[in-house]
Amino acid sequence: MDLVPSFSLETWVLLALSLVLLYRYATYSHGFFKKLGIPGPKPLPLFGNVLSYRKGMWSFDIECRKKYGNMWGLYDGPQPVLAITEPDMIKAVLVKECYSVFTNRRSLVPVGFMKKAVSLSEDEEWKRIRTQLSPNFTSGKLKEMFPIIKQYGDVLVKNLRQEAEKGKPVQLKEIFGAYSMDIIVATAFGVNVDSLNNPHDPFVSKARKLFRFDFLSPFLLSIVMFPFLTQLYEMLSISIFPRDSLKFFTKFVKKTKENHLESNKKQRVDFLQMMLNSQNFKDTESHKALSDVEILAQSIIFIFAGYETTSSTLSFIMYSLATHPDVQKKLQQEIDKTLPNKAFPTYDVMMEMEYLDMVVNETLRLYPVTNRIERMSKKDFEINGMSFPKGTGVMIPSFALHRDSKYWPEPDEFRPERFSKKNKENIDPYIYMPFGNGPRNCIGMRMALMNLKLALIRLLQNFSFYPCKETQIPLRLGSEALLQPAKPIILKVVSRDETIRGA
């Protein structure tokens, strides 16, 4: 039996030519940084460097920072990406040249109508949407929304108490995920759910499906290797967001608008209602109001952007406090002194608590949930005296910078004092960037901090947290694109007294 297929000469020539063309395609851009004299890890044909993310992008970036210094080049498939770490370079990209060159984030995947969301939209469309949304995230608006949010602090205490009373260590992510989901659904859509105790509520089940995708899945890898597939998928209405979830929220927003028009009531202060209210302003700027599709996209992106970040950060904070009991005790003392007898905080009091702010900031330094900041150049540009063409990606490895000994003594240690009033002045805002920086920073930053601080106050008023045999020490991080622990964080939870306010 012949081991080699019996093809005609023409077939063999065609096969060989196809392989040559495939190899040329798979490597055509991979000499880009070498020509410029910029160091970096060697890319693989088709994949570039993405397979090196299997241990986590954060791990890959730290290795590159140590090996290549302040700047290096990498490849996501055929896409050249320039990594920069110098504060002046970062400021130029995120602030000085934001509107002229680096307006847009990298568009990696098919998202359908979700490209209208503020974090995914581009150029003038992004500027208009951001301008419309920004007034909804001011301190004044958040104070109006605070009465909606504070009830979920009590639900959080009740749910955690129920788990703690079982006498077993508690897996935090499920409890904190429910708190995060409840607040997001309430503030984005004005719907009250207790997601921990009602996991089959359609709002809960459809929202949770938004997060179920793997950045190293065959679908997403196909886009990395063959970027032109994104346009094909868009034409076929294939998106990374589940179709049934998008359909559910589309119907809900449509129904909410109909009810709004019928009742002509505008007193609710959730984001959906505020966006619908803005459509009714009859002024010279009315042509800039958000369309129905844009309102839908913002409502969904609030869930997508807020759920994982809040629940994961809360888990990281409680782990840090449990493994640093002196810090936990000091924070409880500040809370008890500021809010005696488990008094409920006001928005202003909560935001003025100095040690609470220090603990949150230090946790966000150690565990920034989004461990990279990325932009796509829309014009030719210069960095460090070198010229780069339009279409070059630029990446800031924020996790690596947050753990860089050049800027942080003993960078892997949890030390809230780094963010004291005295020390905070010495922190470079282009090194510490848990919410990004510049005009395209996280629009929901104030909202996220409010949710985190409310949860921390209510939890530490009522409980103390301790490591147990199931607690992983030291904590190992996972490989997901959004930073998570490799294994769920499990802690022992002890009531501070018998009477828990709000439970």
From Swiss-Prot:
Its EC number is 1.14.14.1. InterPro entries: Cyt_P450 (IPR001128), Cyt_P450_CS (IPR017972), Cyt_P450_E_CYP3A (IPR008072), Cyt_P450_E_grp-II (IPR002402), Cyt_P450_sf (IPR036396), Cytochrome_P450_3A (IPR050705). One of its GO terms (cellular component) is endoplasmic reticulum membrane. This is Cytochrome P450 3A14. The keyword Endoplasmic reticulum applies. CDD domains: CYP3A (cd20650). Cytochromes P450 are a group of heme-thiolate monooxygenases. In liver microsomes, this enzyme is involved in an NADPH-dependent electron transport pathway. It oxidizes a variety of structurally unrelated compounds, including steroids, fatty acids, and xenobiotics. It is a peripheral membrane protein. One of its GO terms (molecular function) is iron ion binding. It comes from Cavia porcellus (Guinea pig). Gene3D superfamilies: Cytochrome P450. The gene is CYP3A14. Heme binds at C442. Its main location: endoplasmic reticulum. Its cofactor is heme. It is found in: Endoplasmic reticulum membrane; Microsome membrane. It catalyses: an organic molecule + reduced [NADPH--hemoprotein reductase] + O2 = an alcohol + oxidized [NADPH--hemoprotein reductase] + H2O + H(+). Induction: P450 can be induced to high levels in liver and other tissues by various foreign compounds, including drugs, pesticides, and carcinogens.
